[in-house]
A protein has these predicted regions:
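Conserved GNAT-fold acetyl-CoA-binding loop/helix
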Residues: 33-55, 66
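Short loop/turn motifs at secondary-structure junctions and domain boundaries
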Residues: 59-63
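Juxtamembrane/interface motifs at transmembrane-helix termini
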Residues: 44-48, 56-58, 72, 100-101
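Acyl-donor (CoA/ACP) binding surface of acyl/acetyltransferases
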Residues: 1-35, 67, 71-187
């Protein structure tokens, strides 16, 4: 998979991340309220952000679909990332996301995630999408609920964070059958 499709929602454009997104990403990735909740350390320099974007771009070489930049249409600002990772073609993937704190509470991630989930089930032919979040990340848990994912259980001591702290994580899942039944009922 060389290029991700460009996906549009009412307020957002989801497109391939690029090195040119580094200044916008660095702006939010330094925030201690964002990275640690997603399992990564706050960025310490723009060079670190550039390196991480490089890793995102390299993930395609390992067979991952890639990372989408979440771009706000109103100002063309990159305000977050969203991706399907731990991808097994035709079977499953995990959904991950991060968003600038300035845009929390506006329904941005659910809006972006709906487009990615549709792409995963319809275009990639996935049978299952999972989301894992720390048990105390209430905002992310709320996103899972809004999206219609089912809480499947807690993996006790299931996540080793960048700083060596071990956390319990909650696993949410959605199958293709659930997704297509849900979307059929919305029509």
């Amino acid at each position: 998979m060389n290029h991700l499709p460009m996906l549009e929602t009412k307020r957002l454009v989801l497109r391939d991340i690029s090195i040119l997104d580094a200044p916008d990403m660095y702006e939010y990735a330094t925030d201690y309220d964002i990275g640690p909740l997603a399992g990564w350390a706050p960025h310490r320099s723009i060079q670190e952000t550039i390196g991480i974007i490089g890793m995102f771009l390299d993930s395609k070489k390992r067979g991952e679909p890639g990372v989408f930049a979440v771009v706000l249409k109103e100002n063309n600002k990159m305000i977050g990332t969203i991706e399907l990772y731990n991808y097994v073609p035709g079977f499953k993937a995990e959904l991950g996301y991060a968003l600038s704190k300035a845009y929390w509470g506006r329904g941005i991630i659910p809006e972006a995630a709906e487009a990615i989930i549709n792409w995963g089930f319809v275009t990639l032919g996935l049978k299952r999408i999972e989301i894992a979040t720390f048990v105390d990340n209430y905002r992310s848990k709320r996103v899972c609920e809004k999206l219609g994912f089912t809480e499947e259980g807690v993996a006790r001591k299931g996540y080793l964070r960048y700083d060596g702290i071990i956390f319990d994580k909650v696993i949410y899942g959605m199958t293709d059958t659930e997704y297509f039944n849900k979307t059929k009922n919305l029509k």
